[in-house]
């Protein structure tokens, strides 16, 4: 059974009167009304985008047991929070279990996540594995630990998913993570490869989903602040300087400010691939290509002057502006 879009009814049901004050309190000021209105828009937008991503990629199906990987960061908190709200009104039934991998990093507050998960009433499992010592022993001082740490973490989470009977593993990567991965692979890996919203795991035994695939990181930052999640900072990899991913993050933030629409268009391009206009001979039969006498609808007309003129994000102020073609960012 395919997972239908779960965004419309849930977002509408969750909508509150943004200008109404609680009983017994004075009427909201104009500033408070504006803040409440913007917060409500933010919540509706995130719920809609998550619901759309789930439907577009059939991420969650009837009877699924979704293992939500909770790190203690803003993204995984938001993912769990929105999935719980979506489940309340979803047209399908599915279970959620939250899983945290305690890697025994110094200073990690072990009590925070269990207390939070008990408070929200979510079944959870804390997996205790000292990967921190392994990483510190094997990675030379001054080198980034992300690669080894990620491999160790993936293997453990795949095993835990099997032990818990989970049918889907949900990770908290968002739109910006996906674009960053695309740029990293292009700039440093020499390949066109991103971070798919849904994929088969490395071991071939699990399906990994990314429900936040359509959500901007800035929206998640605002949402985490609004919901007051008990954020746990990562003092292993998050504090390492000069990480290439951090460079990509800064680049994307700068583009968002200077060229509105550019990052959205890059993200949208991942779903509009034209193999005949790339160079991968495994994706398109260039060697056997012959003139057919039939025009290619995806041919070089895409580079003619007229359609490009309105999408030039380097145009001077007052000139042509970039066209946002991302359907989920219309608020």
From Swiss-Prot:
Residues 1-31 are annotated as: Disordered. The keyword Metal-binding applies. Its EC number is 2.8.1.-. One of its GO terms (biological process) is tRNA thio-modification. GO terms for molecular function: 4 iron, 4 sulfur cluster binding; ATP binding; magnesium ion binding; sulfurtransferase activity; tRNA binding. NCBIfam families: PRK10696.1. HAMAP family: TtcA. InterPro entries: Rossmann-like_a/b/a_fold, TilS/TtcA_N, tRNA_Cyd_32_2_STrfase. It comes from the Bacteria. The thiolation reaction likely consists of two steps: a first activation step by ATP to form an adenylated intermediate of the target base of tRNA, and a second nucleophilic substitution step of the sulfur (S) atom supplied by the hydrosulfide attached to the Fe-S cluster. Residues 8-23 have a biased composition (Low complexity). Homodimer. It comes from Burkholderia lata (strain ATCC 17760 / DSM 23089 / LMG 22485 / NCIMB 9086 / R18194 / 383). It catalyses: cytidine(32) in tRNA + S-sulfanyl-L-cysteinyl-[cysteine desulfurase] + AH2 + ATP = 2-thiocytidine(32) in tRNA + L-cysteinyl-[cysteine desulfurase] + A + AMP + diphosphate + H(+). Keywords: 4Fe-4S, ATP-binding, Cytoplasm, Iron, Iron-sulfur, Magnesium, Metal-binding, Nucleotide-binding, RNA-binding, Transferase, tRNA processing, tRNA-binding. [4Fe-4S] cluster binds at residues 146, 149, 237. SUPFAM superfamilies: Adenine nucleotide alpha hydrolases-like. Catalyzes the ATP-dependent 2-thiolation of cytidine in position 32 of tRNA, to form 2-thiocytidine (s(2)C32). The sulfur atoms are provided by the cysteine/cysteine desulfurase (IscS) system. Pfam families: ATP_bind_3. The gene is ttcA. GO terms for cellular component: cytoplasm. Its main location: cytoplasm. Belongs to the TtcA family. This is tRNA-cytidine(32) 2-sulfurtransferase.
